[in-house]
A protein has these predicted regions:
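Feature marks short, highly hydrophobic, charge-poor N-terminal signal-anchor/signal peptide-like helices
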Residues: 1-10
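An amphipathic, basic-hydrophobic helix/alpha-beta surface used to engage anionic
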Residues: 14-271
Length: 380
């Protein structure tokens, strides 16, 4: 009897001891981090999120729950331990030994343009016998992902894009200085054969052309107007506008041009309209793509005329101006018509999702290129 009582007392002391030990030490030297595989991806592109748990102590963790939430537009393929409502909620269970590091990779698809962050993780641990639970909150640093708008690719728009590209290249050709050499680049179908660099072509085995500097450095400007005065918001057209702007940006930058970008949609971080002055190369490409991803379209948009009318009219360093707007209300149309009278190098892309094209006044038909979304490309 005394021996049995001793066993019971020992078991009780063991239980209480481990419980006190876990309560005090379970989170010590325990690090949890989340990391996206990529800094930025395109809409519809696959990527992964890694959960990294490291237990740098002798005390094992029999059960550790890692809980976090993020935007529901990141479509995770592994649905076990998750639920999706207004947001995506994840609850993963780990068993971590002493001095052990565990990494779990979660595949997902970037379902929609945006800037996504995970700021904190909730941890729930248990004691050795799973009879008690302990909670803590961990701040996650530098866990963010850009999902860039995919370039608009409707066949009708591609035709308009080629036509615009020809117009801009013809205008740029007039600004080239034939006596100032800038470098060599890959041959493109629109290049003149007289610009071919045959020595570089023979050396590399790929067609190369000479690049010239310009008598004056002028830029292409892209303005995006997301202001919507209608009762029903055209969400599909708003997103299509940003995709059209992306296609324009990539096309001009690939030609080695300087590109400026302006949008009255507020940045989700600083709540200011997007203003990126003229620049070129990969740095400008990355900056504009990130700005496009961060544009918040959920609220009321600032007036385009109030924000950008002065910027629009100052066009002394502008080679061409592109406007993207799904709406053609009177004040905005009048502003562009006034500009077009002085500066004819202007193209307005107007996306629409209706079956029939919107009615345009005669004075606007020369200015506007209609971009249909149609059923196969209507909504995101």
């Amino acid at each position: 009897m005394i021996q049995l009582l001793g066993i019971i007392v020992f078991a009780l002391l063991l239980y209480l001891g481990q419980k006190i030990l876990y309560e005090k030490l379970w989170h010590r030297n325990l690090t949890v981090s989340l990391k996206f595989q990529d800094a930025g991806i395109w809409e519809g592109q696959e990527s992964t999120l890694s959960e990294i748990i490291e237990n740098r102590k002798r005390l094992p963790l029999t059960m550790l729950k890692v809980k976090f939430q993020t935007d529901r537009h990141l479509a995770f393929t592994d649905e076990k331990g998750s639920r999706t409502t207004d947001r995506y909620y994840r609850n993963d269970i780990f068993q971590i030994g002493r001095w052990e590091k565990v990494t779990r990779t979660l595949p997902f698809v970037g379902g929609r343009r945006g800037f996504y962050t995970i700021r904190e993780v909730d941890l729930v641990a248990s004691d050795l016998f799973l009879t008690a639970q302990y909670t803590a909150e961990t701040v996650i640093a530098h866990c963010s992902l850009y999902v860039y708008p995919r370039p608009f690719s409707h066949p009708d728009f591609q035709k308009s894009l080629k036509q615009l590209n020809g117009e801009v290249l013809a205008k740029r050709h007039l600004l080239e200085d034939p006596f100032e050499y800038r470098g060599i680049r890959e041959y493109q179908p629109q290049d003149d054969l007289r610009s071919m660099n045959w020595k570089a072509t023979a050396r590399t085995g790929a067609l190369k052309v000479n690049q010239k500097n310009y008598t004056s450095q002028k830029s292409v400007r892209i303005f995006v107007n997301l202001e919507d005065n209608g009762i029903l918001k055209k969400e599909d057209c708003v997103e299509a506008s940003l995709q059209i702007a992306t296609a324009l940006l990539l096309m001009f930058l690939e030609q080695g041009m300087q590109v400026a970008f302006y949008c009255n949609g507020p940045d989700i971080i600083n709540r200011e309209p997007c203003i990126l002055e003229a620049g070129g190369g990969s740095r400008q490409r990355d900056a504009v793509l990130k700005a496009l991803a961060r544009i918040d379209t959920s609220g009321q948009m600032p007036s385009f005329s109030e924000v950008f009318s002065e910027k629009l009219t100052h066009a002394e360093h502008t080679m061409y101006t592109c406007i993207v707007s799904p709406n053609a209300y009177d004040d905005f149309a009048s502003l562009l018509l006034q500009y077009h009278e002085i500066h004819p190098e202007l193209k307005w892309f107007l996306p629409y999702s209706e079956v029939t094209p919107p009615f345009l006044a005669d004075r606007l038909k020369e200015l506007i290129t209609l971009v249909p979304l149609r059923e196969e490309r209507s909504c995101l």
